[in-house]
Amino acid sequence: MNKAKFPTTPLGRIKLFFTLFDSRWEDLTKENWIKIIYKDFSAGLIVAMTAIPMAMGFAMAMGMRPEHGIIAGALACIVGRTFGGSKYQVYGPTAAFIPVIAALIAKYSDPANGGTFEQAHGFLVLVSIISGIILIIMGIFGVGKYAKLVPNSIIVGFTIGIAVSIALTNFEDILGIENFKEFLGQDEDIHGGFFHNLYLAFGNLGVVNIWSVFLGLLTFVLAKYLLKISIYIPGPVIAMGTATFLAATLLADKNIILVRDLYGSIPNNFFKLQMPFLPAMNGSVVLDIVYFVVGIVFVSGVESVLCSSMADRLAKNDRTPFNPDKEFFGQGLVQIITPLVQGFPCTGALARTATSIKAGATTPLAGYFKAILKLLMAFYLAQYLELIPMACIGGILVWVASNMIKPSEI
């Protein structure tokens, strides 16, 4: 890989940050533009089909609505591809953000504390904007390169913890229990005590919906193994479609819980402004702002740099490598803009980036195609997305969790 000559002063970096057609487009030439556009379009289509069920699942795991994941993934990819520092990176919702965002939404939407979902979402917008400003400043002053210095053991431990958390807190969707909290008892934590909850569930199989468990396991198996056959087989989409078809036909009378049962209809008018919200200030709110801002900055900064580095290696990029400082700048804009339009914080997505590269992505065009195709598919399929079984969403999330743990890295 060539030694990159990136600016070394804040002013030089700012100038580069607003240079939209930079070295990321160096592979697009007059001689090969038709071939490049075709390859990028194909990669964008494959990733868009894979990303829709994942985006919906991540959003619901965070306490958000399904459509929030769709708009967040599309808008983050457009902003990140325009202002980021990587040729190949695909931006969108990631599992690493689930614990951070879920904790914020749960706390500030709790009616017992006088909260509402709108207030919680507005507070998320506020802390995300603060995080974005910090990331931009870090990029301007050349801090991006230091994200590479985070020890691998910390990254692996952090990733494993998130994977375990996702798996343990989403299995109730697979069990198909209509009111999980009543089933456990009011004194139980609906998202805690996994082995106790599992013991209760399988000790009361008459309450567990076996057909829901079947759909969850079927989704997991199809998503996991179809992609191993070929990246051109969109395993998650086929899994989602199969589970939805079965729930609407052969299992229509089996009381399968659907997305619309919990969230109502999914609108296709995605773009709505979500203004920031600041709760009444006290010591607890100040600490929460600091806590969530640090979490968002750490996750978005470190994961985006790691993803960009992985992308260069996977693509065997022997020309200009990614620019970590510009990546921080792009991440900052992602965190500022995306939550304002019914979204939430996003970052570089390792699995979707790898899929995009393997499918032939060469320039940032692949990210634009992914975003546009994702929005178009969601717009025309919104009425069908609400028919997806919640067990299918649980199966998708458990599949994501299983992919996050690599025994060779432990």
Label each residue range with its predicted role.
Residues 2-410:
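Transmembrane helical cores of multi-pass ion-transport proteins
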